[in-house]
UniProtKB/Swiss-Prot annotation:
One of its GO terms (cellular component) is cytosol. Belongs to the class-I aminoacyl-tRNA synthetase family. IleS type 1 subfamily. Catalyzes the attachment of isoleucine to tRNA(Ile). As IleRS can inadvertently accommodate and process structurally similar amino acids such as valine, to avoid such errors it has two additional distinct tRNA(Ile)-dependent editing activities. One activity is designated as 'pretransfer' editing and involves the hydrolysis of activated Val-AMP. The other activity is designated 'posttransfer' editing and involves deacylation of mischarged Val-tRNA(Ile). Its EC number is 6.1.1.5. It comes from Francisella philomiragia subsp. philomiragia (strain ATCC 25017 / CCUG 19701 / FSC 153 / O#319-036). A motif ('HIGH' region) lies at residues 58-68. L-isoleucyl-5'-AMP binds at residue 558. Keywords: Aminoacyl-tRNA synthetase, ATP-binding, Cytoplasm, Ligase, Metal-binding, Nucleotide-binding, Protein biosynthesis, Zinc. This is Isoleucine--tRNA ligase.
Amino acid sequence: MSDYKDTLNLPKTSFSMKGNLANKEPMILNKWEKQGIYKKIREHFAGREKFVLHDGPPYANGSIHVGHAVNKILKDIIVKSKTLSGYDAPYIPTWDCHGLPIELQVEKKHGKAGQKISEDAFRKECRKYAKQQVEIQKKDFKRLGVLGQWDQPYLTMDFSYEANMIRTLAKIIENKHLTKGFKPVHWCTDCGSALAEAEVEYKDKISPAIDVKFKIKDKEKLAKAFGLESLNHDAFAIIWTTTPWTLPANQAIAVNNQLNYSLVKIEDFYIILAENLVEQTLKRYAIENAQVIANTSGYKLIGIIAEHPFYSRHVPILHGDHVTDDSGTGMVHTAPTHGVEDFTLGKEHDLSMEIFVKGNGCYSENTKLFAGEFVFKANDRVIELLGEKKRLMNFDKLKHSYPHCWRHKTPLIFRATPQWFISMEKEGLREKAIEAIKETSWAPSWGQARIEGMIKDRPDWCISRQRTWGVPLPLFIHKETEELHPNTIEILHKVAQKIEKGGIEAWFNADDNEFIAETDKYKRVKDTLDVWFDSGSSSMCILDIDKSLSYPADLYLEGSDQHRGWFQTSLLVAMSAKGNQPYKEVFTHGFVVDEHGRKMSKSLGNVTSPQDIYNTLGADILRLWTASTDYKSEMAVSDQILKRTADTYRRLRNTARFLLSNLEGFNPETDIIEFDKLVKLDQWAIAKTKEFQDKIIEAYDKYQTHTVAQLIHHFCSIEMGSFYLDIIKDRQYTAKADGHPRKSAQTAIYHIVHALVRWMAPILSYTADEIWEATPKTTDLPIQLCEWYTDLKSFNDQDELNLEFWAKIQEIRSEVNRILEIKRNEEVIKASLEAEIIIYADNDNYKLLEKLGNELRFLLISSKASLRAIEEKTNNSIESNITGLNIEVNKIEEPKCERCWHRSATVGQNEEYQDICSRCVENITTEAGESREFA
């Protein structure tokens, strides 16, 4: 027996079977950095149509988590796909660098600003800390394979950014959107500052729920309101509240003049309740022997005076539109400095706006009975006092959704303070923002209704904060009238110039007379800007200024929580400063959860860190998981899910390796065969690749990365692995190395690889780079500078052996394989090359299959295949799942060719080559080798 190994075209490639990504990827990343690959992309695509994905800044505090990784990877995939489509698609990362979380970290080390450390030194430490955090996060983002302008990102603490925020504020003031107000705002007693809507999160809280008796001072007036001559017992208005601590600030009781109210007798006193709530309220009180004495309309109660339950204070009954008879008692406790509706009612009726609660959450010195106590701790004292005064009608506990600080996770209070607001009404900002939302494309589509509803319902945006590490609100107000300085716009531009040179410290360290002359009449505002104003200004501070970008951005892509965060603040800043929206399209992705749909938390032990993933499996596995998941809803990840992703990756890598290994010896400059001269199956492979490429590009354009991933996987495992590559192995390995059949297949493989590597590049960025290095090519460009492959061809209308034809062949082949498997299990054959396959076909199937002539056997990977009319079917044939098709499989008794392993009667016919078939002899001894037309 001779050794024919040297006569075979054995596969060979530098592209390894094992990914070994955790070790290889850092080397590839290092190569990109040495090449300056991002800069080369910018130079190569300069002058092309722009596509700008604007980066929402992550907060510069702590290591990145898998949610950060998902966000950056999705952005990177989209930007890279747009580059492949020929766009100039820059990506400039940004970071959010001011605010409380950084202050808290610095406080841990240095103490509070103004106590153990000066405010100036504190700011320097904050800046230093933020810079360190940016570098930590940047390293992780780069390791994920994300390309961008990492050497010059935008930081909200850059002097130029801080200065441009002040200029943006100037435009907002110029457009008359800024107002000063004394209003109740969400207040965090731990932060000692007001919070914006985006900084508030709602969690369940158990609160005391009490019904309080307010004694009616004028019983005669009350009797008259109910159509009675007199009342022989005391009467009480009953309010229900879950915030007993606000009772010291009570100034009124609100009723609705459109509701009906009942006077109810209980033993020796009367209570007033909304008529529709009498039954359920008495049931709540467990009172059975009460009697409704009379009913009246709410408007008749207006103006009646009650007495505060523990202060000598008259409390009027007033009308409030917000009062309903859905729950409670239909009479609402009104503390103007602790609620939005209460405040509005207080302003309407000139109620006292005395502040009883300080910024630290403790009652002020002028709060009788409770001075110095923390409000939530005072709840018990208030309830106890009400009991002593016999003013507590009922006491329960209620579990309800309550606002909490996003950072401290502690309950907030509503507290009226003087603050600066962007008014939603003053210049029609609300309506303009809603119109802009309608002009923007939102995906998923429910995002539009969500943000629209939020804008419709949101209060004025409180943009002032009482913090140390933040961009100042550099205003001067009159010491007596508190009006803004008449030259405010000019002053702000002067401040911006100073900040551009010396950062925010230049404002805090400057004297007032550096900005204004009338320091005796005007005082500076000491507040800082809400950090959401920082990130919300990015369209004005980056897109509107950086000439390498464009305004508005083509795309904003963030997590679904940003409808109430960055999407909204960006819109409000842009609309109030510039008058149009900052984005054309807004996409959101879901949150990352574990495989059971639970939020990730250290306490549950279900945290999957991106660092662990890329240090073990590789960043490309994380990228593939991200792309494969439909990110419009929650994205589940776990070790098991990532293991499945790694299995998918292996299949893709193996396909790429098989393709590359069969391009050994192929020179694209001399060996490419024209499409119409290719073996028909190779024509199909190219046309099928073209069909998939069209779908893949369409999916990329729609940002449907999961569809892209599915298409690539299907292409590799089904169209290639289970069909085309399986069939061409024989031709690739055994045909003459430079003969037409092999060069035809290599031409198809060359085109397939060039298309496939580009499809993969946005998702499997490291692997695509590795594939590209091992690919024969006619260009020196790195894969990152390439565009979609354009040398693919489709069948024309005259081609009989078109995609439809081959789809039917694939269907028939699947049935043949099914029956071959049956015969393997029955031990009739061990391998398909031992089989003789006879297909009995009806007229339509016969006409289809006879087009392949004697090459049908190559498609079926058998040594012998024949076609007969269905009428000739034998009892040995098996009916297939295709109508009009029976299949018979018999074992071939002919000898095995030691070179191609086919069974053939021609083995031994050549005296020089006794153990191989005539086809192999032809491939070894003749100049042209065998010929193929179809397969």
